[in-house]
């Protein structure tokens, strides 16, 4: 009897580990929502600038976490989480990897606006470059940031890869 159940047990074992896999992963490359097949979000550049600045400020305040973290199994199955909002602009995060991920609020902000004091070219390459249409892209990680040398990254508890940031319209506005 045990030998006939072996394939079933293996399948169940694999299925129990599959909870962490996003079966509809999205690419890390920037996608602007004015591309064919996408829906422009009609958000404002002022709000995009505000949310990026707010995220930098929030992550720098004593007592606040320095990292935005998406743990498993909480963030599995392609779940999208609200990071912050301002008016019509909603910043969402989606875990597309199969590992728990954590990134600095600075890296999220830089992904949105190209960085504090960004050049026009840096802004154009960031989500800000999608304009009022909004868009999405993988977090651009500053691998030189010493915060990524903390034990949770060195020991493999977290990766700094696999989080997609989306700028979309706040459905409540």
PLM feature spans:
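Short, surface-exposed binding/anchoring microloops in extracellular/periplasmic proteins
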Residues: 25-75
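Predominantly extracellular/secreted and cell-surface proteins with exposed
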Residues: 64-87, 94
């Amino acid at each position: 009897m045990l030998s006939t159940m072996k394939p079933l047990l293996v399948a169940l074992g694999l299925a129990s580990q599959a909870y962490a896999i996003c079966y509809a992963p999205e690419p890390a490359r920037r996608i602007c929502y004015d591309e064919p097949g996408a829906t422009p979000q009609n958000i404002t550049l002022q709000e995009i600038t505000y949310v990026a600045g707010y995220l930098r400020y929030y992550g720098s305040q004593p007592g606040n976490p320095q990292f935005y973290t998406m743990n498993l199994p909480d963030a599995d199955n392609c779940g999208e989480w609200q990071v912050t909002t301002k008016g019509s602009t909603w910043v969402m995060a989606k875990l597309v990897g199969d590992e728990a991920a954590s990134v600095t609020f600075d890296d999220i902000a830089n992904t949105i606006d190209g960085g504090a004091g960004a050049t026009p070219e840096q802004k154009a390459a960031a989500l800000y470059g999608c304009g009022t249409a909004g868009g999405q892209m993988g977090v651009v990680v500053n691998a030189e940031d010493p915060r990524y040398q903390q034990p949770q990254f060195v020991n493999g508890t977290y990766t700094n890869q696999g989080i997609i940031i989306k700028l979309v319209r706040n459905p409540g506005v």
